[in-house]
């Protein structure tokens, strides 16, 4: 709702707005569903059920993508996305989750 309001007010020139979408992790019960589940929730859900989980994203992949974009590309990114920017999950935080789960399993 607030995103629509900010976009509309920005379009009309009332404000110079920008919306940031923060990533959330919602662990759903039951088996993963391709439409609603992500690998991040699987990394937390499967170990809770005593199952093995696999992280399909390499640690270097996110950093190489950021390096590919380069510095000072904010204007280019805003031109493509408009006034809504989805912030990607921070990979080091995901690695901390994985290490904590592995430590609990020892």
From Swiss-Prot:
Localization: Membrane
Keywords, comma-separated and alphabetical: Membrane, Transmembrane, Transmembrane helix
UniProt xrefs under InterPro entries: Glcn_transporter
Domain of life from the UniProt record: Bacteria
Stretches assigned to coiled coil: none
Transmembrane residue ranges: 78-98
A UniProt-annotated Pfam family: GntP_permease
Membrane topology recorded in Swiss-Prot or TrEMBL: Single-pass membrane protein
GO cellular component: membrane
GO terms assigned for molecular function: gluconate transmembrane transporter activity
Keyword match Membrane: yes
Entries under PANTHER family matching the protein: ADP-L-GLYCERO-D-MANNO-HEPTOSE-6-EPIMERASE, NUCLEOSIDE-DIPHOSPHATE-SUGAR EPIMERASE
Protein name (database record): Uncharacterized protein HI_0094
Organism for this UniProt entry: Haemophilus influenzae (strain ATCC 51907 / DSM 11121 / KW20 / Rd)
